């Protein structure tokens, strides 16, 4: 799964298959390095603007579950690749639960 660059309006939803749970639903953009930490010196020094803006389109339930489990700094340091997000056991359990849910 290749990280994407946001298009003109990253907050706009688009439909497709969520890479985390596999459901066909409206998708939202998740920054792999959360925007809240973009101004911190460590991240400005080690990452260029293009890398800071990479992310994944995923469903709202998966996206919310990620942010409920981990704070922005942890996400930026430890979960800044799609592979790291999908390999985490706690997130895997959440994604499996979301996959069993019906879309309202």
Residues of each region from the PLM?
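Histidine-centered nuclease catalytic patch
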Residues: 19-55
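Short, charged surface segments at domain edges that flank catalytic/cofactor-binding sites
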Residues: 1-17, 47-53
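Short, intrinsically disordered terminal segments enriched in charged and Pro/Gly residues
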Residues: 1-10, 74-104
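Residue-level signal for well-ordered alpha-helical segments
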Residues: 3-11, 32-43, 59, 71
């Amino acid at each position: 799964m290749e990280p994407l660059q946001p298009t003109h309006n990253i907050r706009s939803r688009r439909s497709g298959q969520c890479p985390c749970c596999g459901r066909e639903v409206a998708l939202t953009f998740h920054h792999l390095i959360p925007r809240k930490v973009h101004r911190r010196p460590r991240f400005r020094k080690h990452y260029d603007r293009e890398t800071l803006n990479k992310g994944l389109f995923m469903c709202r339930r998966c996206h919310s579950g990620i942010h409920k489990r981990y704070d922005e700094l942890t996400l930026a340091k430890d979960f800044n690749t799609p592979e790291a997000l999908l390999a985490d056991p706690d997130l895997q359990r959440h994604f499996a639960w979301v996959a069993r849910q019906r879309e309202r």
